[in-house]
A protein has these predicted regions:
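Cytochrome P450
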Residues: 1-132
Length: 132
């Protein structure tokens, strides 16, 4: 699924803060109840233990519905369904009207401005050809 894989690999939410509700242990580190934790969505969505070859873009990926680009459970973004629908429409229209998409800069030149909550490119310089 193109939309879900784009969301997984380019998670729009940088992180969220949560409070541990009980004493826990994660990777050998004790986490007492009441500890404030920062959940890095992009790390979770690229975790090789959760997604085979988590750094790779693969629209045929299994278990894609387990990605957490918009959070999870009661904390899930209320606009997630709308955002997904907007992406579906945008990709469909772009593919219907244009061809030969190309990134106009080296990927290393793409810049994500610092933001505590959200993650998005400052610019996406691309070129394409209109369909006739």
């Amino acid at each position: 699924d193109l939309v879900e894989e784009v969301l997984r690999l380019s998670t729009p939410t940088a992180n969220m803060w949560r409070v541990a509700t009980r004493d826990s242990k994660l990777s050998g580190v004790e986490i007492p109840a009441g500890t404030m934790l920062q959940v890095r969505y992009s790390s979770a969505n690229r975790d090789d233990a959760q997604f085979d070859n988590g750094q790779a873009f693969d629209v045929t990926r299994d278990k894609i519905n387990t990605q957490i680009a918009f959070g999870y459970g009661v904390h899930m973004c209320i606009g997630a369904s709308l955002a997904r629908k907007e992406m579906q429409v945008a990709f469909r229209v772009l593919l219907e009207r244009f061809t030969d998409f190309a990134l106009d800069v080296d990927p290393s030149e793409l810049h994500y401005p610092p933001n505590v909550l959200l993650r998005g490119l400052a610019a996406l310089p691309i070129s394409f050809i209109g369909r006739t």
